[in-house]
Amino acid sequence: MAASMARGVSARVLLRAAGGSWGPRAGHAAVTSRTFGTTGERRAGEEAADSPELPRDVVNVVFVDRSGKRIPVRGKVGDNVLYLAQRHGVDLEGACEASLACSTCHVYVSEAHLDLLPPPEEREDDMLDMAPLLQENSRLGCQIVLTPELEGVEFALPKITRNFYVDGHIPKPH
């Protein structure tokens, strides 16, 4: 029976083949169907997108896009910078979805805040080595988690990235 179920044969067909039915039999309870619920989609490392509830949880961040436009956003303590940018329409790709397998979320961290971040781990450094236009203040947005000390931080996007999407395509979170 398990092999049949694995091949996609429904329980109803199996019950009928065995002489059973979905209706109640004398001395037996009726078979009821079950419904399944799902939780909202969330990628690894992504925090809930709701606004910070307490002022102490707010971290004001400014993204500077490739054209130089400043985009101020309100993040919250614990937010991942890549997902924060994507929620606010900032063109930060994140092709590998924060799995440290690309460098498309490469950002420049404001000098005043760079030393407030923990040093990059070896895997992040390895990915940054593949990023074009690397600078001393380069980091991967997927590896930066907001803390209260990062209040007022600026993340500038480099003029180019080694992207994995077709020109003109606007990246969207998966």
Swiss-Prot record:
Residue span, 2Fe-2S ferredoxin-type domain: 59-161
Set out the biological process GO terms recorded for this chain's protein. [2Fe-2S] cluster assembly; [4Fe-4S] cluster assembly; iron-sulfur cluster assembly; P450-containing electron transport chain; ubiquinone biosynthetic process
**Mind listing the GO molecular function terms for this protein?**
2 iron, 2 sulfur cluster binding; electron transfer activity; metal ion binding
The record's comment on cofactor binding reads: Binds 1 [2Fe-2S] cluster.
Which cofactors?
Answer: [2Fe-2S] cluster
| Transit peptide interval | 1-43
Task: Say yes or no: keyword 4Fe-4S present.
Answer: no
According to the record, the residues making up region (Disordered) are 26-52
Q: How does it assemble?
A: Component of the mitochondrial core iron-sulfur cluster (ISC) complex composed of NFS1, LYRM4, NDUFAB1, ISCU, FXN, and FDX2; this complex is a heterohexamer containing two copies of each monomer. Form a heterodimer complex with NFS1. Interacts (in both their reduced and oxidized states) with the cysteine desulfurase (NFS1:LYRM4) complex; this interaction stimulates cysteine desulfurase activity, and serves as a reductant for Fe-S cluster assembly.
| Similarity field | Belongs to the adrenodoxin/putidaredoxin family.
UniProt-recorded name of the protein: Ferredoxin-2, mitochondrial
